[in-house]
A protein has these predicted regions:
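Conserved beta-strand-loop-alpha-helix junction that forms the acyl-donor binding cleft
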Residues: 124-133, 150-155
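Acetyl-CoA-dependent GNAT
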Residues: 12, 16-22, 26-95, 107-113, ...
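Conserved glycine-rich acetyl-CoA-binding loop
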Residues: 71, 94-108, 117, 128-134, ...
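Short Asp/Glu-rich motifs
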Residues: 44, 48, 133, 156-157
Length: 185
């Protein structure tokens, strides 16, 4: 027998990003950023991806959008920073749709795409402390990279974040191989 409350939960689909999604994605980014108050400077919390950057990601097939009733509620934006690796540049879920597996499905879509594209790994940088950041990604098989493991491309990501005002001591760079191998077990 079905529970009435479970029948009211929204259904989510992960779709390829489209131009008509762009205005909603900035709203999602700002709403999700509010959860990081106290972890990031106010200036960073007000940043959003530019329309040009999102259009470029759409054209490259590197933007995944979670929709509910055809409305965007979250998104993942990946980049190809270096040969053989995708970098999860942005993951945001509107707080009204948090803790329902939307972020997990978006990360899964990026990792599935990377594996299907014969890429070796997915990397990302995130906050160390909030449970929906590094601990969340660790639960999905990502591991923290030590400083000596950072590639030149990942060092540039860290340097860019530092210039934006993010404290590198509060951040981690993480890695997940796309195949079960000793490199990411």
């Amino acid at each position: 027998m079905r529970n009435a409350a479970s029948e009211m939960l929204p259904l989510y689909a992960i779709v390829a990003g489209r131009a008509e999604h762009i205005p909603a994605l900035n709203d999602i980014e700002l709403a999700a950023a509010r959860l990081l108050k106290g972890y990031a400077p106010e200036s960073v919390l007000r940043e959003t991806s530019s329309a040009a950057e999102l259009r470029e990601a759409i054209d490259a097939g590197l933007l995944w959008v979670a929709v509910s009733d055809a409305r965007p509620v979250g998104f993942a934006h990946a980049k190809l920073l270096e040969a053989g690796r995708a970098h999860l540049d942005e993951l945001d879920v509107h707080p009204d749709h948090g803790r329902r597996g939307v972020g997990r499905r978006l990360v899964g879509a990026v990792c599935d795409w990377a594996a299907a594209s014969s890429l070796d790994a997915v990397t990302l940088s995130t906050f160390r402390a909030p449970p929906w950041n590094a601990p969340f990604y660790a639960s999905m098989g990502f591991r923290v990279l030590a400083d000596h493991e950072l590639t030149p491309a990942l060092r540039r990501v860290v340097a860019q974040e530092t210039r934006r005002g993010l404290d590198p001591a509060q951040r981690v760079v993480m890695y997940r191989g796309t195949r079960r191998s000793p490199a990411w077990l």
